[in-house]
Amino acid sequence: MFRRSKNNSYDTSQTKQRFSIKKFKFGAASVLIGLSFLGGVTQGNLNIFEESIVAASTIPGSAATLNTSITKNIQNGNAYIDLYDVKLGKIDPLQLIVLEQGFTAKYVFRQGTKYYGDVSQLQSTGRASLTYNIFGEDGLPHVKTDGQIDIVSVALTIYDSTTLRDKIEEVRTNANDPKWTEESRTEVLTGLDTIKTDIDNNPKTQTDIDSKIVEVNELEKLLVLSVPDKDKYDPTGGETTVPQGTPVSDKEITDLVKIPDGSKGVPTVVGDRPDTNVPGDHKVTVEVTYPDGTKDTVEVTVHVTPKPVPDKDKYDPTGGETTVPQGTPVSDKEITDLVKIPDGSKGVPTVVGDRPDTNVPGDHKVTVEVTYPDGTKDTVEVTVHVTPKPVPDKDKYDPTGGETTVPQGTPVSDKEITDLVKIPDGSKGVPTVVGDRPDTNVPGDHKVTVEVTYPDGTKDTVEVTVHVTPKPVPDKDKYDPTGGETTVPQGTPVSDKEITDLVKIPDGSKGVPTVVGDRPDTNVPGDHKVTVEVTYPDGTKDTVEVTVHVTPKPVPDKDKYDPTGGETTVPQGTPVSDKEITDLVKIPDGSKGVPTVVGDRPDTNVPGDHKVTVEVTYPDGTKDTVEVTVHVTPKPVPDKDKYDPTGGETTVPQGTPVSDKEITDLVKIPDGSKGVPTVVGDRPDTNVPGDHKVTVEVTYPDGTKDTVEVTVHVTPKPVPDKDKYDPTGGETTVPQGTPVSDKEITDLVKIPDGSKGVPTVVGDRPDTNVPGDHKVTVEVTYPDGTKDTVEVTVHVTPKPVPDKDKYDPTGGETTVPQGTPVSDKEITDLVKIPDGSKGVPTVVGDRPDTNVPGDHKVTVEVTYPDGTKDTVEVTVHVTPKPVPDKDKYDPTGGETTVPQGTPVSDKEITDLVKIPDGSKGVPTVVGDRPDTNVPGDHKVTVEVTYPDGTKDTVEVTVHVTPKPVPDKDKYDPTGKAQQVNGKGNKLPATGENATPFFNVAALTIISSVGLLSVSKKKED
């Protein structure tokens, strides 16, 4: 591919383009040349010719050959241009040819009767020609060896791949939808890539492009919808049998699922886990997930077989109870005899809990364990009620002794002591002092024994405590306060509070100190004693002394030492630091004074004497102040500050050169300065009218420099009108087919006021029957004869195309299960409406009856903003409902005959059910099991469960034949009847039944009952 460059000579959109006729002489021949190269066309008075359209390489003597390396655009001597590349700015016509060194070329396109100077003006597909005019190094048209001007025309095919490329991307987007199979997607995408590579690298015609669009449409039809894995494969659930209480893991369940090879389905338990503590069949739902995310559901059956019932769960023994007086022993046998054990259980009771303590009244629970023959055990409780013995009063009641406090020496009577005893209400106990009376002359705690006598003669003993408190000691004898001391500088007053605060008074004494002696005179150095009296709450007092040490006043450092300030001399402008200033201060040895600058710093830019204040601070915080003098001597003035040169000015006509000397001669330098001027700035460009500033530098003997500016006024040459004014072409818009006059065109040209330019149409008039932009060349002639050229654009708007002809909506399709309603919105959402069309879909045809399986076409009308309408069809595929397995298959129950008393298992019953092949139905006994101890026909209900969860019910008949009657039950031998007391009473039976009549009657009754039972069952 190549880039586009601008073709200045033949781009007719350029304003101010001028054409002229020149006669060039080549040897003995003169040739008239037209610079527009529009072969075979007469324009004005220009006779223009054109070379035959052939490959440049076959034109002898031409400086141009076709660039065959660009295979997409040059093949077999012809040129090809894709308007798609033109829109992207990828086409440069000058790169279609290869020129000899130093040669240049200009080009023009011809398509039909139209000529274009720029590739971007190409709009339509079809045949065209591209003509080049070759110029030599001198810029003149190149003349071949045969005397002909070097003009090369190439046959051009213009095509547009834009629609094809859009279609490729549309199909590519569709193919990448996951709903298609990988194989069909790969086939389509590979085909699209092949087509795109072809059009990206090889030249085409518009017919080729249209054929490729058909190819792309055919490729899209190769896309095949993928079948979900769940519809490809048919996993089945298995079954397992475990004893009651045996746990079953998820893995054990999923391992029972049979998943088809190659499906890569992964089973997961999603239903309730089986409770193996409950015997019976447990269905567990397992979900199989395939790689495409679809899922199947199967059922695994866990058969839980019941475990034998232990004796302890068969029988229910109970504990009894008994009542004994307090202290009466109870043996283990007496306890176990109270346990009621069910007959036939053969359980043996044993006391295993604590034996009852019958010394303690109340209910005592005793644990008894009952052990059965199978080793299992039950536990029951026997209750022994122990009734209490009568309790003596002293054990019923709990009197307590009290306490009292009396001052030392205060007597206490027996009544005061017994009044302190608390005797429970209702006990009627009487207290009496029986121990030693307390001696209250002795401080401390005295214990007194008191005896409480109850009405039943029993007695309790308690103690009463008498606390004897000692007489009080005066505070002044209890406590020992001490005086303190303090040190103050001479002249510092000391308050009474400061003195009393120095007295140390024992904690808890509550003593209050008061100064009672002379106050210290702190103006007198030395030790001063001050008497302080401490008064206690009981009014007693103590006296202590406080010492005040008065120290003489010290002399301040600032009065001891005498520092002095120094001086220094510096040149003007030399800075002086604080340290340099403080270093000039003389501070007495040993004073440890520190100098600090506190006054204004000296401005050394100002000559003269500057006083600076320095403060000296001593260790005791006192300060001295001294002055330091800085003498500033003035510095010499440079030449550039002594003198003031000035720049001058001059006026010259445009284009007149000005030398450096002419410029420096304009600088005025003060006499005596000996300054030398030099031009250092840009020299003035006198080709440009206006004021030009030139920088000149003046250098003095001391090396200093000044800078001034010299002004050169350049007066302009007279400007031709065409260069003074800049007319502009306008534009207008007309409907297709509306004629436009020259005046309407020239009226659109904006000519600057005062220019007096006159516009004239000189280019082709616009063909308004052809929609698009038409450029018209207008020439503006000024009074001085100069001319400007501008372009006027006539926009021809095409007749409006109705929206329904612009856009192509398409109907979609959807699949729903039978009976699923489909709303209008769901239907209109399936219509693909082109972006930007703003079309609104509405269902106008019959709504689909989704109760009827099959394909239903629904008409949808798309209404556009301009009111036009399109009609499309949406297809609703209705898939039939699946028939439940129970309606597909018809299992039948069988029958079997067994002797009376022969047990029949569930499996034997379910094996009699005939289940159709392929149904995968599983039979389960759900009705009452047959009692084979009863002869007759027994109906057993069996439920058949199919993979889809639906169920059928059938009946299996079990015929129970009665056992044969043994001879001993058939016959009844009898002895002679015996008479007792002359009456016909029978003797007690000692063996077989006495009368055959009874046996016959009994058999008759039993047979009747049996027949009734069989008859009833048959009716049931």
UniProtKB/Swiss-Prot annotation:
A motif (LPXTG sorting signal) lies at residues 987-991. Gene3D superfamilies: Surface Active Protein (1.20.1270.150), Surface Active Protein domain (2.60.500.10). PROSITE patterns: GRAM_POS_ANCHORING. Residues 272-281, 354-363, 436-445, 518-527, 600-610, 682-692, 764-774, 846-856 have a biased composition (Basic and acidic residues). It is a peptidoglycan-anchor. The keyword Heme does not apply. Residues 227-964 are annotated as: 9 X 82 AA tandem repeats. The modification Pentaglycyl murein peptidoglycan amidated threonine is found at T990. Residues 320-329, 402-411, 484-493, 566-575, 648-657, 730-739, 812-821, 894-903 have a biased composition (Polar residues). The keyword Repeat applies. InterPro entries: ACP_C_sf, ACP_N_sf, AlphaC_C, AlphaC_N, LPXTG_anchor, M_anchor, Rib_alpha_Esp_rpt, YSIRK_signal_dom. Residues 991-1020 form a propeptide. Residues 261-281, 306-330, 342-363, 388-445, 470-494, 506-527, 552-576, 588-610, 634-658, 670-692, 716-740, 752-774, 798-822, 834-856, 880-904, 962-989 are annotated as: Disordered. Identical repeating units define protective epitopes and may play a role in generating phenotypic and genotypic diversity. This is C protein alpha-antigen.
